[in-house]
Amino acid sequence: MSVSVNIENLTKEYRIYRNNKDRIKDALIPKNKNKTFYALDNVSLTAHEGDVIGLVGINGSGKSTLSNMIGGSISPSSGEITRHGDVSVIAINAGLNGQLTGVENIEFKMLCMGFKRKEIKKLMPEIIEFSELGEFIYQPVKKYSSGMRAKLGFSINITVNPDILVIDEALSVGDQTFTQKCLDKIYEFKAAKKTIFFVSHNIRQVREFCTKIAWIEGGKLKEFGELEEVLPDYEAFLKTFKKKSKAEQKEFRNKLDESRFVVK
C-alpha cells in the first residue's frame, strides 16, 4: 500500500507566560527563559492507504493536537508531516462560523476547499439531506446544539470525498440514528481504502472500526501498531487507571503534565 501520511519527529510546543510582562520580555530578550509546554513531543508514524488509525489516550494526552496537525489547522514547532491527498477534518466545531447560517457555512467551507460555486450548488442538496437539519440549515450556527454542529460538519466533510479523513470525537454527540448513518458512511470510506484517523474514547467503536492504534500519553507516542497488538495494552492501562481514586487519577495526570514542562 502507498504511504498517505508520513509524520517524522513531530513536536508542538507552547511558551507559557504568567502575565503580559513575561510575554514582552520574551519578545525583546532572545535568550529569556520561560516555561515551555510540549503538547506533542517527537512523534513519528506512517499511515498507508486503507489504514484506519485509532488515536487513543486519556483526556489531555495530545490526541486532538495531533489530529489538528494532520488536518493542517495547527503548524508544528519542529518535525515534518507529509500528506499525499486531500484531507478533511470532522470535529464538532471545525471550520464552522457561528455568525453564518448552515447553508452559508457549507458554501464558505467548500470555497475554502477549492470547490467552484457550480460544484457547490450541485452538492448542496446532498449535504443538506445528509445533515437532517431541516429548516435549521437556514439558521445561524451559533444557535445550533453541539450535536447539530457535528451533523453539519460531518455532512460537509463526508460529501467532498477526501483521500484522508480525520474524525475527532465527532460521533460522541448527536442521536444514535445519525451516528449509525455516519458509521455506515465511514465504512464505505474504509472499503474504498481511504486513510482514516479516528479520535475516540469509545473503545467498542475503536475495536470494531480501526486497523491500527496510536496510543498517545503525555504528548508522546507510547505505542503504535496493529490493533490486536496495541489495544489490549491500552485497555489494560485503562482498567488500572479507572480503579484509581479520583485523587490518584489527578496525581497521575499531574505527573504527566509536569514532565511536559521544560524551562528553556
Swiss-Prot record:
Signal peptide location: none
Pfam families, sorted: ABC_tran (PF00005)
Ranges of residues in domain ABC transporter: 24-243
GO cellular component: plasma membrane
Sequence positions that bind ATP: G57, I58, N59, G60, S61, G62, K63, S64
Presence of keyword DNA damage: no
Coiled coil region boundaries: none
Subcellular location: Cell membrane
UniProt keyword annotations, A-Z: ATP-binding, Cell membrane, Membrane, Nucleotide-binding, Translocase, Transport
Catalytic activity: ATP + H2O + teichoic acidSide 1 = ADP + phosphate + teichoic acidSide 2
Superkingdom as given in the UniProt entry: Bacteria
EC number: 7.5.2.4
Transmembrane segments: none
Matches recorded under InterPro entries: AAA+_ATPase (IPR003593), ABC_transporter-like_ATP-bd (IPR003439), ABC_transporter-like_CS (IPR017871), ABC_transpr_TagH-like (IPR015860), Bact_Polysacc_Export_ATP-bd (IPR050683), P-loop_NTPase (IPR027417)
Keyword field contains ATP-binding: yes
Membrane topology: Peripheral membrane protein
UniProt GO molecular function: ABC-type teichoic acid transporter activity; ATP binding; ATP hydrolysis activity
Oligomeric and partner information: The complex is composed of two ATP-binding proteins (TagH) and two transmembrane proteins (TagG).
Primary role: Part of the ABC transporter complex TagGH involved in teichoic acids export. Responsible for energy coupling to the transport system.
Family designation: Belongs to the ABC transporter superfamily. Teichoic acids exporter (TC 3.A.1.104.1) family.
Protein name: Teichoic acids export ATP-binding protein TagH
Phylogenetic lineage: Bacteria, Bacillati, Bacillota, Bacilli, Bacillales
Gene name as annotated: tagH
